[in-house]
Regions:
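Detector for outer-membrane/organellar transmembrane beta-barrel domains
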Residues: 304-423
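Outer membrane beta-barrel
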Residues: 118-158, 162-280, 291-294, 298-309, ...
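Extracytoplasmic loops and strand-loop junctions of Gram-negative outer membrane beta-barrel proteins
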Residues: 116-120, 161-168, 240-244, 282-284, ...
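Outer-membrane beta-barrel "beta-signal"
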Residues: 435-437, 461-475
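Sec/Tat signal peptide C-region and signal peptidase I cleavage site
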Residues: 16-20
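Transmembrane beta-strand segments that form the barrel wall of outer-membrane beta-barrel proteins
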Residues: 193-204, 272-276, 310-318, 402-415, ...
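N-terminal periplasmic/intermembrane-space "pro-region" immediately following the signal or transit peptide
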Residues: 21-148
Length: 475
């Protein structure tokens, strides 16, 4: 403030018309008068600053800028909460991910996620406390299948053909459907941090590039409402693959719901959620319909530390159908334990195991397959049992090169009411090599193997080679 006043006063004095001086002595008198005026103003400013409780002689703060380097995890986590309003303190160690499911996940107090600890790319709306970001990435996938894989765009093991006449047909595919756009807004409020998140990709149809909604939600404090990840799933445990589908034994579901998290402190939270129900049944006929009379209810306990995290989730469901001759109801539900753990300097171990009855909707391989329960010949509804899981390991060869080794499996119990060609078991294996020469640029190669077994014991398998190029808009 003082420097500004002095500059203005000096400019005004020297800009005034200069009158002719009779002698050098008169000029010196004018200079002394200017000095006295400036000293008087400086004393007055000192008095005003003392009255405001500031030190009159304190110099402006100098912010030093260090050379570009890989910042420690703690520094990155602190930077996000300090620079972006409406953000809680992140805890998990930073990690890389091509699909980056963590960035869209809802978190207590809208904390930064492990794939974006600095929350880069936000800019302020003038005159408000709101900051916004437009993000996403463009991704091109080149895919070569040794045999028919069923789904040409994603490696979904439950869709592998078994006993098909065209089973041995190889295929090449090139697509950019994983390309996505996101919009995010954050701001602090008197009731907690406010976050709005919107995300789309182009997996809306199998034969084109139809826009698909992935996330659309708002979160105030620890209360979430909208459409996005189920509270039951754990986005931070999903492994780093070029393939978009990931292991079939992982918990995965996009659904509308309301969540509320209770923060116990020290990285411990408990989340309760009510989510849109959908009884996905096998054995239905023209005169039977699935009914949903209660929301799916989930309860999730989570522990986060600087070495990783553990999450235990449970879901309870009401499954049912109505028919012309009979109706029936069954309880469904299950649990999942998942987590991550740092190994060495940058390596990471990821895992998840789940099991239950009527849980197919909540798995990556079987969501939408109609295998939560089956209607028997006697009209009774039978909730189908399943177990599954995955494990993944990320190894950094150098700061720019990394590899992932992943295995997943999902198994459903045999049931006489199911069709002979219904799902029995799937296996998923991946090895990849990923190069990220710059934060916004990633490319890699991935080898995938998948196997599907039907209820009658018949099997089919295939191998896929996938290459990907990805450009992140902000990273």
């Amino acid at each position: 403030m003082r420097c500004s006043v002095l500059v203005i006063c000096s400019a005004a004095l020297f800009a005034a018309p200069v009158h002719a001086q009779d002698s050098a002595e008169a000029l010196r008198q004018d200079i002394r008068a200017v000095r006295q005026t400036l000293q008087a103003m400086e004393q007055r400013l000192d008095a005003l600053e003392r009255a405001e409780g500031r030190s009159p002689a304190s110099p402006p703060e100098v912010v030093s800028v260090a050379p570009t380097a890989i910042a420690p995890a703690a520094t990155l986590r602190q930077a996000a909460s300090a620079s972006v309003p409406g953000t809680g303190q992140a805890i998990l160690p930073p990690r890389d991910s091509v699909a980056d499911p963590s960035s869209a996940a809802s978190r207590p107090d809208s904390a930064a996620g492990p794939t974006d600890p600095e929350l880069k790319g936000f800019f302020a709306i003038p005159g408000t406390e709101t900051v916004i970001r437009i993000g996403g990435y463009a991704k091109l996938d080149a895919i070569a299948d040794a045999r028919a894989a069923g789904d040409e765009d994603q490696f979904i093991t439950s869709s592998i053909p078994v006993g098909s006449a065209h089973r041995d047909t190889s295929n090449f595919n090139l697509h950019a459907k994983q390309t996505r756009f996101s919009f995010e807004a954050r701001r602090p409020t008197s009731r907690g941090n406010l976050r709005f998140y919107l995300e789309n990709d182009f997996f809306g149809s199998s034969d084109g590039y139809q826009f698909r909604l992935r996330h659309a939600y708002g979160q105030l404090g620890n209360t979430y409402a909208g459409y996005g990840y189920s509270s039951f799933m754990d986005a931070d445990s999903l492994p780093d693959t070029l393939d978009f589908a990931g292991p079939g034994g992982a918990g995965y579901l996009l659904v509308a719901g309301i969540h509320h998290s209770f923060n116990w402190g020290k990285g411990n939270t408990l989340t309760v959620a009510a989510e849109d129900p959908d009884s996905q049944l096998a054995g239905t006929t023209d005169d039977t319909i699935a009914v949903n009379r209660l929301p799916d209810v989930t309860l999730t306990a989570r522990m986060e530390r600087d070495w990783g995290h553990l999450q235990l989730g449970a879901v309870a469901r009401s499954l049912g159908y109505d028919g012309d001759q009979r109706d029936d109801r069954r309880f469904g539900g299950g649990a999942q334990l998942s987590g991550s753990a740092s190994v060495g300097e940058r390596d990471l171990l990821l895992f998840g195991v789940l099991g239950g009855k009527g849980l197919s909707r909540y798995t990556a391989d079987l969501t939408g397959s109609g295998l939560d329960a089956v209607i028997g010949a006697d009209g009774r509804l039978h909730a189908l049992s399943l177990q599954g899981g995955f494990v993944g390991y990320t190894h950094y060869w150098t700061p720019m090169w990394r590899s992932n080794l992943i295995y997943g499996q999902l198994t459903m119990a045999r049931n006489a009411a199911l069709a002979a060609d219904a799902f029995r078991q799937s296996r998923y294996g991946v090895f990849n090599l990923i190069w990220s020469p710059a934060p916004s640029w990633t490319m890699g190669m991935e080898l995938l193997y998948g196997q599907l077994e039907q209820q009658d014991g018949q099997r089919g398998d295939t191998m896929r080679l996938q290459g990907s190029l990805q450009y992140n808009f902000i990273k």
